[in-house]
């Protein structure tokens, strides 16, 4: 297994800070406090010739990113994120039924929640909207992608009952406030480590004012890894 070395500490920042010792916005999870020069395994099949290219090798690459500037040898979140123009977002005042319809129509599993000025105020997922933790026993686990066969029908009936109780409920009542965020300049390796090794499926990308500018997902990371590998193969 080959590995990529990164020397930039994580750039994650909470959306808000609080002076309260019990505030969930004051301290980040311990795994985010990474020291420089830790090793991050990007992919099991990531060959040595496909390491993140230096500035010289990347100059002739046809790697497709969001940036048209010359390669610096370090990939950032901003180059591979989904930009806000392509995102589906909701507001705290969006009804749960409206949000669920958008989820189904667009085949997605969650939304960033923004205010009138595009400031990020939370995240909401399909599980939040349906309160599925209340019918799943021990709650959602990322490792169990498919439900037990004998529980499927019971779960379906429970979802139907939950849908009958969503009238009048708003996204703001169910969203996760002040989620973990990254910036466009955050090292892609740092974001990938969080997305691939934890429960997080998506990380909102915000500017210095806390306004949403994009989102980086597990799918974005996998796509980036494939593009980097192909670029390395061409330059080998």
UniProtKB/Swiss-Prot annotation:
Organelle targeting sequence: 1-53
InterPro entries according to UniProt: CBS_dom, CBS_dom_sf, CBS_domain-containing
Record SMART domains: CBS
PROSITE patterns named among the record's database cross-references: CBS
Modified residues (N-acetylserine): 54
Broad class of where this protein is predominantly found: plastid
Subcellular location, record wording: Plastid, Chloroplast
GO biological process per UniProt: cell redox homeostasis
GO cellular component: chloroplast
Ranges for domain CBS: 81-142, 175-231
Key words of the record: Acetylation, CBS domain, Chloroplast, Plastid, Repeat, Transit peptide
Residue span of region Disordered: 47-66
Pfam family, one: CBS
Protein name: CBS domain-containing protein CBSX1, chloroplastic
Organism of derivation: Arabidopsis thaliana
Phylogenetic placement of the source organism: Eukaryota, Viridiplantae, Streptophyta, Embryophyta, Tracheophyta
